[in-house]
Amino acid sequence: MRSYYVCSWHAAKMMARQKSGLIVMISGYTGVTYTYGVLFSATKCTVDRVARDMAIELEPYNVATVSLWQGLTLTEKAKDNLAKAADKMTGSVAGQSGSSVEHPGRVIAAMALDPAIMDRSGGTFITAEIADAYGVVDVDGRRIESMSAKRGSPLWGPVRENDYHGR
């Protein structure tokens, strides 16, 4: 959690000066469903909350913060684990086709170009669903499916949606 906060703090200082920016924190479905254990789940819940609270503090500077739930990302390590022990993987991974490591970057790039990004600030979003909203596909042309029906949905919407500013 410390690295999320420290990196965001430094980025926010630069972005606030220029009165624009987007900070994206990568989280996951484990924010609402058991995945790898208490510490992992608690950390991801905290990531979502930090993105939300930062949105409130950074709104006057036109800096947006969001948390994205990525789901299964086919990193080299994930591919290796699936090849070695797919039968032992948790139910949280079963049934997911996964995305390339490039997919979230494509989604973040689309978000960064959105002139209305502040309307999403403070929200937690499923990367696959945001990809659909922006028309983003994976490097092989596939549409990545949301796992929300099986794994749950985010708790936090954008701060502007509820006009919530902690007052």
PLM segments and residue spans:
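A structure-centric feature marking long, well-folded core domains of fungal metabolic enzymes
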Residues: 6, 77-78, 106
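A short helix-coil junction within the Rossmann-fold of NAD(P)-dependent oxidoreductases
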Residues: 10-19, 114
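Catalytic loop of short-chain dehydrogenase/reductase
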Residues: 5, 16, 22-60, 70-73, ...
